[in-house]
Amino acid sequence: MGFFSNFFKKENSKDDAKNRLKLVLIQDRAMLPSGVLENMKDDILKVLSKYVEIEKSKLNIEMCPYEDDPRKIALVANIPILKSSTREVTKTTKQQKRK
C-alpha cells in the first residue's frame, strides 16, 4: 500500500504554498499590480460569454513561465465550453456584413 500511496497522494499545504509563491513571483516578473489578473479573467469571460456558454466552475486562467524561454511570461487559459450561443454569433455576423 505504501508504494502506491506515493502515486496517488494529494497536494498538501506545502505544495499549495509553493504554487502560490510561484504565482506571486510570476505576477511580479510580469509587473502586474495585484488584482489585474482577476480583472483580465473577468474581461475575457465577458467577451467569450457573448459567443459561447462557459463552465465557469472549471475555468482556469493563469500566468506561467513561457515554455521556450522561462524568463518570459505566458497567459494560459483552459476554458471549458458547454455550447455555442448561436443567437449572438448570428447577430454579430449580420452586423459585420452590414459594414
Curated annotation (Swiss-Prot):
One GO biological process term: division septum site selection
Keyword hit for Lipoprotein: no
Entry keyword Cell cycle: yes
Domain of life of the native organism: Bacteria
Coiled coil: none
Gene Ontology CC entries for this record: plasma membrane
The entry's keywords: Cell cycle, Cell division
Functional description taken from the UniProt entry: Prevents the cell division inhibition by proteins MinC and MinD at internal division sites while permitting inhibition at polar sites. This ensures cell division at the proper site by restricting the formation of a division septum at the midpoint of the long axis of the cell.
Family to which the UniProt record says this protein belongs: Belongs to the MinE family.
Protein name: Cell division topological specificity factor
